[in-house]
Amino acid sequence: MQKISKQLSAVISPFIFSACVSQSTIQDFNQQSAAKARVELALGYLQQNNPQLAKINLDKALQHDKDYYLVHSGLAHYYQQQGEIENAHREYEIALKLNNQQGDLHNNFGTFLCRQKQFEQAQQQFQLALNSPNYYHQADTFENMALCAYSAKKMDIYQQALQKLRQTDSKRAEKFNTFK
């Protein structure tokens, strides 16, 4: 009887352990990580000029985590590239409601607003980007501020942003020497 019990244990034990592993794997699945991976795939497809596959991945990202700012930021970028300005604007606003501490998000929204000739709102977003915690792309924002101010013919803001860009990244600021 003991021999049968040991043999039965030897046969059943692997199944019990594999069931535990399977259970753990399912529980460890992180919806936000899956959403982020889908957004990254979508951005890659956009770079390859494949908006259909980009949208499919963004929709799947939304299914994984509809409350993740990065999904809505990705959708905003998608709509922006497709020329769907109202949808892009809405998605930027949703992303900011979900997480307004992301400097890259403020910077991207500022760039979007500048392209829509909403210069004052764009400058506000750039300023919010610069004031965001743990934001390390100041040179990008100063460059965008300068370009936007130049487009709006706001030369005082342009000069201020350019000066900050020189202090942050002098090589990047050099390309503005052709602007007069």
Regions found by a protein language model. Give the residues of each.
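Canonical positions in the second alpha-helix
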Residues: A61, I94-A95, L128-N131, K164-L165
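Canonical tetratricopeptide repeat
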Residues: E40, G74, N108, N144, ...
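Helix-start (N-cap) detector for alpha-helical repeat units in TPR-like alpha-solenoids
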Residues: A34-A35, Y69-L70, G103-D104, H137-A139, ...
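Structural marker of alpha-solenoid helical repeat scaffolds
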Residues: N30, H64, L98, S132-N134, ...
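Bacterial Sec signal peptide processing site at the extreme N-terminus
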Residues: P14-K36
